[in-house]
Amino acid sequence: MKKWLDEEYPAISARAKAENAEIHWADETAVMNTDVRGRSYSPRGVTPATRSVWGARQRFSMISSVNNQGKCYWMIIDGVFNADRLIVFMESLAKDAPRKVFLVMDNLKVHHCKPVKEWLEKNKERIEVFYLPSYSPELNPDERLNADLKHAITTSVPRRTRQGLLKKTTEHMKMVKASPERVKTYFKDKHVAYAADSQ
């Protein structure tokens, strides 16, 4: 982690400035209607309990990226997250970004599997990928977006259907994308302050 903060990331940041590239941080998360967080109340000595939502558990995945200029990109994934879906996301990100993208992600196996490496080699003029140190999610600003989304879902009326969960997720993510100042607050956490002024 120290090497990342003292050497690796400063080198990435310097390259981004020299090449007029944007640095984005990406991550995947599972979105579920059974994720219970927040506060509750019960009499002293009694463990608080919450009711689970009616019906079957609903779940899907989302991949997203943020940068310290307040930009946010996201994609809902119905089914298993794999190389093909990662490539679709990176293609969309590279297409929409006005400059070359330096994408920082964790070391999930799919992030550097053969199909992804081959695609990146063909598109290296538009996008490059860099990897965070292993077991260091706290260094990724996109983790704050994930926490923001899950807080929004778990503090609202429970979503009992897949469609309801998808609707709430989409509404929240559209709001985040349209709120650059909100995205910038993700970079105020002490663990990711290193990334706040790097481009």
Model-predicted segments: where are they?
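Short functional hotspots at interaction and active-site rims
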Residues: 1-199
